[in-house]
Amino acid sequence: MIVFIRWGGLCAQILMFAHAEASYFDAPESSNSSESCPLPMDIENKDGVFMSAAKRTGVAWVGVVVGAAVEEVIRFNKAIFVLTNSAIDSEGFISGCVYSLSGGRFLSLRLASVDGREHVMSVGAFPSWRVSLDYYSPAILECNDQFRDACSVILK
């Protein structure tokens, strides 16, 4: 009898793990619908205006640092996401992707639309987003993983 209870417990754990793994890595079906903070080497500086192409047409990553005409982006620090509706698929917006510059200052890139409209975003089930320890609000998430596409969001 004890063998059956242990066997049942083991099977339940395996099934729960398999279900959790499937939802943990639930990425969007269309790769065009996701965006992530660009790599430092993909960011161009033109007289203090920092830009990087986005995956989706009609949007780009943009940031400005006054007096940083010759500085280079050297390191990604973190991305900050503000939840506006956590009940619906963790909707909100990226407040910024924060980078270190060669002169010791910081750069914050935002996702800007060519037509000026704001995009509804979601962190979905991307595992790199966690509640920020730098802010006193569960509505502010951060991602500081360094690998490509770690800090992804879904554009809706």
Describe each PLM feature range.
Residues 1-3:
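N-terminal secretory signal peptides that target proteins for export/translocation
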Residues 20-156:
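Mitochondrial intermembrane space
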Residues 6-16:
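Bacterial N-terminal signal peptides
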